Amino acid sequence: VTTTHPSSRTQDAVLSVRALHKSFTLHSIDGRIVPSLHGVDLDVHTGEHVALAGPSGAGKSSLLRCIYRTYLPDSGSVRLRTAAGPVELTTLGDREMARLRGREFGYVSQFLAAPPRTGPLEVVAATGRRRGLDRAEAREAAAAALHRLNLDETLWDVDCGVLSGGERQRVNLAAGTVEPPRLLLLDEPVSALDPANREAALALIDSLAGQGVAVLAVFHDMDAIRQLASRVVFVADGRIARQGAPAELLEAVA
């Protein structure tokens, strides 16, 4: 287990985070400022699956959201290696950031955000089109992803709003992994799934490594971490406390 953080950027890193800080103002408690991330350094490489572990409130989801720019960091650097070269995400304009999302990197949150009266097939196919597929290719890729995640075809054109939590989570994961980008951020992607569908989802995520897709994922499920992760990063109080191989690190923090 290593407790050191990278100081210089690794040249072949898909994602390189340095000195990342983020705080939140709690307006309901006298405007108190609460730190969430304290100088986080992290690299993720091509085909590497990195699991973020740690207690609730440690800053794991905040880190993903700062990388994806759902949250704007207070300070620090988030660099993504794109097809055109490295790009600093913290200073990128909104239009360019929107262009990179999906094509260069993706984010699967815990909850599906789908337009009203839109079915799973169209939701997943829309992501495929944003990633460069034509309409027919996108629908074919969407169908393959939904099949792999065991979503019954009778639900493919049903309004996503009436699906169960587990069904919505599978649609969300299918959309994230269709024609996958070079980096995928996952926030508790299997938390609502029953055992059979959980295994199908984990197998799909695991297969991304063979496609060279880097994954940075938040998991509370230690079995999922053992199955998927090539490296575990343990986050505590907004800092990276330690990191290492799954068997070694999980034994150390048990």
Please name every model-derived segment:
Residues 68:
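Helix-to-loop junction immediately C-terminal to a conserved catalytic motif
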Residues 86-106:
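ABC ATPase NBD coupling module
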Residues 219-220:
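H-loop/switch region of ABC-family ATPase nucleotide-binding domains
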Residues 159-163, 167:
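Conserved ABC ATPase signature
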Residues 118-129:
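Q-loop/switch helix immediately C-terminal to the Walker
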Residues 137-154:
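Conserved ABC ATPase "signature" region
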Residues 176-177:
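ABC ATPase C-loop
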Residues 184-187:
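Catalytic Walker B motif of ABC-type/P-loop ATPase nucleotide-binding domains
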